[in-house]
Amino acid sequence: MKKESMSRIERRKAQQRKKTPVQWKKSTTLFSSALIVSSVGTPVALLPVTAEATEEQPTNAEVAQAPTTETGLVETPTTETTPGTTEQPTTDSSTTTESTTESSKETPTTPSTEQPTADSTTPVESGTTDSSVAEITPVAPSATESEAAPAVTPDDEVKVPEARVASAQTFSALSPTQSPSEFIAELARCAQPIAQANDLYASVMMAQAIVESGWGASTLSKAPNYNLFGIKGSYNGQSVYMDTWEYLNGKWLVKKEPFRKYPSYMESFQDNAHVLKTTSFQAGVYYYAGAWKSNTSSYRDATAWLTGRYATDPSYNAKLNNVITAYNLTQYDTPSSGGNTGGGTVNPGTGGSNNQSGTNTYYTVKSGDTLNKIAAQYGVSVANLRSWNGISGDLIFVGQKLIVKKGASGNTGGSGSGGSNNNQSGTNTYYTVKSGDTLNKIAAQYGVSVANLRSWNGISGDLIFVGQKLIVKKGASGNTGGSNNGGSNNNQSGTNTYYTIKSGDTLNKIAAQYGVSVANLRSWNGISGDLIFAGQKIIVKKGTSGNTGGSSNGGSNNNQSGTNTYYTIKSGDTLNKISAQFGVSVANLQAWNNISGSLIFAGQKIIVKKGANSGSTNTNKPTNNGGGATTSYTIKSGDTLNKISAQFGVSVANLRSWNGIKGDLIFAGQTIIVKKGASAGGNASSTNSASGKRHTVKSGDSLWGLSMQYGISIQKIKQLNGLSGDTIYIGQTLKVG
């Protein structure tokens, strides 16, 4: 009778009181405004993140969905967008945690067996949940990690191939003891030196750590685990097992998997950098190369490259970009010292813009300044500004003091023969890499090119290590660059002609002055880009016995008269390495083999020397075409400078020089010079008939990737399509030629 007289509410409360702690520890989905959820750990649509309570929760706690914030870091999971979910995960699965003992009927958005009633709104306190891990396999060719993950549970019969990581997050309430600014400062301390040493963006790594770890609130990212990026496996034998979603046999299941356990955040950042720099599924081709600073124009190119590779979430780059923008993380993309250690340090005693004999001239950056604007103002190249001030990109700050002119005694470039750093005649000079060093920084410090540093030390990329000993100057018997002792501007029979670079010089300007191609200048002097220094001595004409250009008649590698010489690419090869090996320019290798970027493959056969009858570029006098006549060509739809240069056996640099082309933009119907006669001089005029080559954006595409694919610069793609930023959309049609 007493039971019948009880009201519905009383009966409900009585039922709730009967629940055991084990029942309350069933998997629940927790979203709150204090919880930032990264969709990196979810396949396309955000999946629920399960949490197990460590103590009995209030009987009427209500689980609320978190609204999407302006930064786009929180998304409400929906069952409609869960990819391939033919059967919703339930807590009676054989792969759930041991505490999940009863069946459940909830969908993936609420995988708990029963939600508490809404009579009370008591929130779940911080630290009361031991969160589960959300995990996703990157979109990549099948491969395993360099460090195999330990064996998991016995029921793990299906192995999901992982390219890099299974991005795992565990979530609890955001810690009230650490503010976002404090967390950012802690990340910056680790990210800055590691990113700088590995040619990565500190801003992108920090944003990844924030998004992946929920601002350090995940159990996986907290002590004693310190795993900010959810990398699976073990680290120095240490791992921690946590629950993660896996899509096996057509259904989403929760499995216990091992995740790496680090001594501190520093090791977590180092490990992630290692992943971004070394992951490869084909010899010589690095999966995340599109996120490296040297291959991008801004952090946005890097985040776009990671989308669809590091994470399947199509909005991954937007989430990272939002965090970077909202918290000004780009401020950490410059060296932590804030000054130049390459081309000469800032002298506090000299006034900005005060040019004194023997000293540097400085300029203090004002609002609205850019490197291009400052370079034009002082008549120097952007490359020089970067070199003198240790700047790797275009980021400068208001109030920053820059070197804008080098004094007579401040030359760090060229071929100085001083005895610094124990440089002895006939022997090499060595340098031991310190924390924060990069190849660009060391090259600027010792006045050599990055290409020479790579060649002298057998480095194929940009990865160097603290404590590594590098050759930074070659002894008298081993000089391979442009620092030979010859009379400057003194052309002698049988010897090279040298030129000492002055302030304001560029490779294009010098090439035009001496009637040679930019490609030849690069090849003769071991220059891989456009970076030159005031005071640097370079070869501008090769003597009769010193030709190392693209048409030298060496007999190596089965070179036969009148035929091309081929080389089969081996693992670890790069275009720079091959060009140095065969004494040709990278530009020629690209032109002869129709390569638009730097991507080559092990086993690929490429032309490394052009035969006498194959139209190879004469690197001594590239403008010498017998008969005194100029050959012209009318561009057809689909043509590119690389394609035309390969067709006519000339360099892209020559095509640009002969036709006044500054970038890669050409038009169908345009007539250009493809061979110069002895007396030819004028530039061909161009028409405005645009070609119709277009590309429809797919998942994972980026402006950098399209530029590599179609042999066109990022700036040209933006110009053709009226893009002001780097954001492109799936399904968008872009002009690419």
Curated annotation (Swiss-Prot):
Residues 339-352, 410-419 have a biased composition (Gly residues). CDD domains: LysM. SMART domains: LysM (SM00257), LYZ2 (SM00047). Its EC number is 3.2.1.-. Residues 67-117, 420-429 have a biased composition (Low complexity). It is found in: Secreted. The keyword RNA-binding does not apply. Gene3D superfamilies: 1.10.530.10, DNA polymerase, domain 6, LysM domain. Belongs to the glycosyl hydrolase 73 family. This is Autolysin. It comes from Enterococcus faecalis (strain ATCC 700802 / V583).
